[in-house]
């Protein structure tokens, strides 16, 4: 027991002596110039002058590296809400077999293609958009990837068919798509066209830095690929119907696009100068709406 007690006292004495040793300061001493002391990033220079009191000058070295901003910024989950419509340039007298007319009834015409403006909705969901600085932050290249969802609600009871029995023909069949004036009244009658789309725009902004408030304007083009087309209808006689098929719509869509406003809310618009149908109808869509985006 005595040996254990003595050993404990010896260890405590050695530990106390070690703790009392003065810590070595983070200093650098220059014997040739003993009026200068460096402590980390602080340089202390002491100069003796003829004045009664010594003068001490402290020089602080700034080691902070300026932050480098990336020329590319990314915005995820951009959302558009607006309205779809189109300009009808169809020559109905030369539409051919795509339009089926009922014998004894007025011919299918432009009035049959009129839309319900308040219900024809355009929703765009951009998975991401990127902005590449070209001239400081005031001129940028904007591009991205997303989906365009267009819904055209018709006033008249028209129907689109991929193929099948031709109405009012006595049972004749066709493998070609067609549109006709139906015999029932629909409470809901829309043609939906959905696209994968890549926009490319030149952006001009007054904001000095990405994410800061400022006026912004962008103009450019977009390319879309049609991945879904369907005619959705509701009526008392037939109930709910969703007819998916190929209605002879163009697979690819080229559009002029633009946006205007102040972050995070701005206006957007698009116009397709060519028909979205391969033949028969000459329909040129346009959209307008509000975009919710960080920049």
Where do the model's predicted regions map?
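Residues that define the transmembrane beta-barrel architecture of outer-membrane proteins
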Residues: 73-77, 117-123, 192-198, 213, ...
